[in-house]
């Protein structure tokens, strides 16, 4: 039987990442495994899990967990708002700065080439 992903479970993982109790590689591996093994009809969960599965190549770091927590904390009735929040978020991230900062990092480094 497929396990259903729940918002509160994901929020607790995101909080652990945000507080650096989990590192980026750990939450990334968790997301890949959970996405393979679990199901959800929740569009916000899907959007957050897609972001988490792309941590290395999209250069998401622990500070980004907060916007995902905010999106998942909105009521399900406000899913459109949450999706817009997540979709617009990359536009405010300084990716060039992250590439410079993370180019020696074992997880992110391979994705930091120009």
Language-model-detected regions and their locations in the chain:
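Acidic, Ser/Pro/Thr-rich low-complexity regulatory regions
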Residues: 1-114
